[in-house]
Amino acid sequence: YQLIQFFHSGKKNKEPVFKALQLAKDKAAIYPYLIQYSIIANDKTLLAEYAQKLYAASPLTPNVYEYQYNTLMSANTNAVIYARGIGDLVGLAMVQQATNIRKDITLKYYEEGMDLEPNAYLCLSLGREVIAKYPNAYYTGLLVSLNPAGDFTELSNHISNDFKKERLDYAVA
């Protein structure tokens, strides 16, 4: 019930999610929602705490870790990455906060009609309908950049210099 209240608040009311944590037998099951709340509320302390707790309780598989790592590496310095799901936003926060990867990046919860910050990137998981609203966007690896005047240089640099490819190499071997 508490999580439903949290969802109905647009994931902006902290009382129901903290009540759900208090009542839960499996605290780690509530951590993803606390991570989402902390990103929406821009609470970096809470984000670090619960991303690290979730990572300790339920580490990402090597394939998922590499995907999330490469997603973070698809952005330039001091980027803002917009996502909105448990599968993308929470995984990115876990890798970033628990392993200190790309702490220069700000993670944001994407909402329709919001003003996007400069140096903005969208997660592919936002879907075609959202990405299509930005006709000048371009792929940078596992993200879409909204920065003007992009070309394939950024994509090429990320793939050649920044990406981990161990799991990909393993998959084709």
What are these regions (language model features)?
Residues 89-97:
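A short acidic (Asp/Glu
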Residues 82-86:
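Short His-Asn-centered micro-motif
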Residues 1-70, 74-77, 97-173:
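ER/secretory pathway lumenal C-terminal domains and tails of membrane proteins involved
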